Amino acid sequence: MTKILIVEDEQNLARFIELELEHENYDVDIEYDGKPGLEKALSNTYDLILLDLMLPNINGLEICRQIRQNQTTPIIIITAKSDTYDKVAGLDYGADDYIVKPFDIEELLARIRAMLRRQPQKNLIDIKGIIIDKDAFKVTVDGQPLDLTKTEYDLLFLLVENRNHVLQREQIITDVWGYDTEVETNVVDVYIRYLRNKLKPFGKDKCIETVRGVGYVVRQ
């Protein structure tokens, strides 16, 4: 499901947009303050962000700038500022579109659809803030890169791709190390420990559950 973040301090407007987007089958998060809005944008994977300019604590331009340093997520600015200077500033800071309040909700929905059509499909798996980019062979946790060896990456990918399914140690060895390997099953336990140690600073080590006597599972 397409995920959209709304960062807007006018709660009634934010809630109205949320209801309209949910009616269109979008998955929606809302933040009413700039600081948590920025944190949520950087620690999650969104398909599009709707961003007000005049926000508490961190203004929309600064949020836009910081997002652009880390992501290419499409940003549509929604604001009462209608001057050409403000529009140019918003676009120069990295926004992809700019719509002035008050606006017709149908126009906003059309702009969202148009923006999403222009975006390439992301080949990502996202579970509990652990994001695996299958094209780039990279993993981020809450927006921060996770440094993994090839074997660690292959093991984490296997667990996440088979989320909610308990994988036996023998199956893990076959899928990660290959059919003709002489690796013992206890090596799986060693690499699970490596992964948990790397996930622990993010509070994600418990995402990999042990099923005693069987193997391991990552649950959605």
From Swiss-Prot:
Gene Ontology terms: cellular component: cytosol; protein-DNA complex
Main location: cytoplasm
Localization, UniProt: Cytoplasm
Keywords: Cytoplasm, DNA-binding, Phosphoprotein, Transcription, Transcription regulation, Two-component regulatory system
One GO MF term: phosphorelay response regulator activity
CDD domains attached to this UniProt entry: trans_reg_C
Gene Ontology biological process: regulation of DNA-templated transcription
Transmembrane segment boundaries: none
Pfam families per record: Response_reg, Trans_reg_C
InterPro entries: CheY-like_superfamily (IPR011006), OmpR/PhoB-type_DNA-bd (IPR001867), Sig_transdc_resp-reg_C-effctor (IPR016032), Sig_transdc_resp-reg_receiver (IPR001789), WalR-like (IPR039420), WH-like_DNA-bd_sf (IPR036388)
Disulfide bonds: none
Residues that bear 4-aspartylphosphate: D52
Processing and modification events after translation: Phosphorylated by ArlS.
PANTHER family reported for this sequence: REGULATOR OF RPOS (PTHR48111:SF22)
Its biological purpose: Member of the two-component regulatory system ArlS/ArlR.
Identification of the protein by name: Response regulator ArlR
Gene from which this protein is expressed: arlR
